[in-house]
Amino acid sequence: MNENLFASFITPVILGLPLVTLIVLFPSLLFPTSNRLVSNRFVTLQQWMLQLVSKQMMSIHNSKGQTWALMLMSLILFIGSTNLLGLLPHSFTPTTQLSMNLGMAIPLWAGAVITGFRNKTKASLAHFLPQGTPTPLIPMLVIIETISLFIQPVALAVRLTANITAGHLLIHLIGGATLALMSISTTTALITFTILILLTILEFAVAMIQAYVFTLLVSLYLHDNT
């Protein structure tokens, strides 16, 4: 019986209980709060990384945009930790589900757009019709700008889903090929196993980069509307 390549993306269930809830809540354990007066190396490294990322993301924002700092940092930690947990054996990655990513992207995008129309109504409407547009092109340009606006959350969610899913499928395929080649050619199996290790390391980087890209784009949407 052929194995379904997408079986690893099905939500695992034990005793009738879906594990996705525990997997989504578990990342908070990866970032513990130290009660010591002098932080250990892990907590110090964690704080340094958070300060570095927050400085890069919030440097473009004004005083109103700075109020979104906590939300953006929580978002990048949530996406990054769930992506990393999905690389563990027999685990499930929630960010491979388009429904979940749309559930994150649409409210964040809608909040940014509504904030822009409330605080900068004229500037927000001006995005639909750039200055100097020829009169015959005005109706078409307004339609194009409207479509591009509403496609932003879809592109945001699809980008994250596609990148995470593609990496997991490659790991699954190369891992299966390695197991199949072990009984045929040990040398070839070692080569594919080396490729598998390198690809896994690359996926760790992709998991963090995609969390950064998702949060950075949300930050840019907020910057355009605050």
Swiss-Prot record:
It is a multi-pass membrane protein. It holds the Pfam family ATP-synt_A. InterPro entries: ATP_synth_F0_asu (IPR000568), ATP_synth_F0_asu_AS (IPR023011), ATP_synth_F0_asu_bact/mt (IPR045083), F0_ATP_A_sf (IPR035908). The chain crosses the membrane at residues 6-26, 68-88, 97-117, 138-158, 164-184, 189-209. GO terms for molecular function: proton channel activity; proton-transporting ATP synthase activity, rotational mechanism. Its main location: mitochondrion. One of its GO terms (biological process) is proton transmembrane transport. It is found in: Mitochondrion inner membrane. The keyword NADP does not apply. Subunit a, of the mitochondrial membrane ATP synthase complex (F(1)F(0) ATP synthase or Complex V) that produces ATP from ADP in the presence of a proton gradient across the membrane which is generated by electron transport complexes of the respiratory chain. ATP synthase complex consist of a soluble F(1) head domain - the catalytic core - and a membrane F(1) domain - the membrane proton channel. These two domains are linked by a central stalk rotating inside the F(1) region and a stationary peripheral stalk. Belongs to the ATPase A chain family. Component of the ATP synthase complex composed at least of ATP5F1A/subunit alpha, ATP5F1B/subunit beta, ATP5MC1/subunit c (homooctomer), MT-ATP6/subunit a, MT-ATP8/subunit 8, ATP5ME/subunit e, ATP5MF/subunit f, ATP5MG/subunit g, ATP5MK/subunit k, ATP5MJ/subunit j, ATP5F1C/subunit gamma, ATP5F1D/subunit delta, ATP5F1E/subunit epsilon, ATP5PF/subunit F6, ATP5PB/subunit b, ATP5PD/subunit d, ATP5PO/subunit OSCP. PANTHER family: ATP SYNTHASE SUBUNIT A. This is ATP synthase F(0) complex subunit a. It comes from Bos indicus. The gene is MT-ATP6.
